[in-house]
Amino acid sequence: MLPTNRNRPQQRPARSWYFISDMDFSDPKRKPRYLSKILMVALLTAMCVVMLTQPPCHRRTPSVFSIHEPGVTHVLVTGGAGYIGSHAALRLLKDSFRVTIVDNLSRGNMGAIKVLQNLFSEPGRLQFIYADLGDPKAVNRIFAENAFDAVMHFAAVAYVGESTLEPLRYYHNITSNTLVVLEAMAAHNVRTLIYSSTCATYGEPEKMPITEGTPQFPINPYGKAKKMAEDIILDFSKSKKADMAVMILRYFNVIGSDPEGRLGEAPKPELREHGRISGACFDAALGIIPGLKVKGTDYETPDGTCVRDYIDVTDLVDAHVKALNKAERGKVGIYNVGTGKGRSVKEFVEACKKATGVDIKVDYFPRRPGDYAEVYSDPAKINSELNWTAQHTDLLESLRVAWTWQKKHRSGYGPPQAMVL
């Protein structure tokens, strides 16, 4: 029989746990706290085991857009939901470029993005990011999360008349936002920029046609804002650490649409009064507006109306792609993109009547502030250096192609609720 000693009970020594400091289970007040620590350690250990043992297919893999892939050029297209930007994205995708579109949809159309996504649905071809270039943090994050090889910068408000009414908006949207893009490019080592500029930077030159050497004296906030953006780009490109490939394309009045009828021009309803003359002609032909308003009949031109160089959007985006392919680090190229032939507004309206088959009502009004009498290009430099020549120079045919799209899309790309991704 084992001896007992009830009068002198022996105290059991407290266990020590080497992985938790100050552990003393002999103290009942501390026991709950110690148990919670043990449970937390066990939980963290279990989580680590699960993460390390799960199959590779369940682990998050980097997006293809965040990786530089040999043989694939990844182009950021700002304003890619807009009229010109969407056509440029279409051409890039057709030519097997990888494309990221950034747009805040203030002027662009989600419908154009949807068309492109349906055409190029293969993984790694196209992504759309909703963002405002006026937000430096958002822009920097986009550059940090994506491996861009080049930027085509289209995003901008672009109506001469509107710029005279809201000049500060134009300087902020065009000039300031271009600076934001440049800073992000510099921070993330993206060295190729194709910049969408305008003949409006020349103002009202004394001599025609306009060459790249024609002095730039813009006469409206739109042209001035673009000129400032050009100056910023050129100054930065000259700095030793920039080492950039820069192409600045100053283009003239854009018309037309995708020849296959996939994309077209669809300005927001509230902006139609500021829009291009082709859009106004089509709206009049469709009965959306009662007639066409021609502003200015007393210019020093053959028929008193403004003379412009009308460039088809298909030719314009071809110039951008050729500029991208020819861009070289440490070099800057500046090119006019036009047909080299001027047409008066009256000529344009007559061509639009023929293209639509509608006898459009025309009303004449005084000049619009900020407009200039005559502007057309000398495309010799771009012809020679980029081997680019406008192919769609038949004004009537360009208008017919655009009219085909407009007839099928009276409300643009459709109601917003039908375009949610």
UniProtKB/Swiss-Prot annotation:
The keyword NAD applies. The active site is at residue 222. One of its GO terms (biological process) is UDP-L-arabinose biosynthetic process. It is a single-pass type II membrane protein. The chain crosses the membrane at residues 34-53. Gene3D superfamilies: NAD(P)-binding Rossmann-like Domain, UDP-galactose 4-epimerase, domain 1. The keyword NAD applies. Residues 1-33 are cytoplasmic. One of its GO terms (cellular component) is Golgi cisterna membrane. Its cofactor is NAD(+). It is an enzyme of class 5 (isomerase). GO terms for molecular function: UDP-arabinose 4-epimerase activity; UDP-glucose 4-epimerase activity. InterPro entries: NAD(P)-bd_dom, NAD(P)-bd_dom_sf, UDP_G4E. SUPFAM superfamilies: NAD(P)-binding Rossmann-fold domains. It catalyses: UDP-beta-L-arabinopyranose = UDP-alpha-D-xylose. Pathway: Nucleotide-sugar biosynthesis; UDP-L-arabinose biosynthesis; UDP-L-arabinose from UDP-alpha-D-xylose: step 1/1; Cell wall biogenesis; cell wall polysaccharide biosynthesis. NAD(+) binds at residues 74-105. Residues 54-421 are lumenal. It holds the Pfam family GDP_Man_Dehyd. CDD domains: UDP_G4E_1_SDR_e. Belongs to the NAD(P)-dependent epimerase/dehydratase family. NCBIfam families: galE. This is Probable UDP-arabinose 4-epimerase 1.
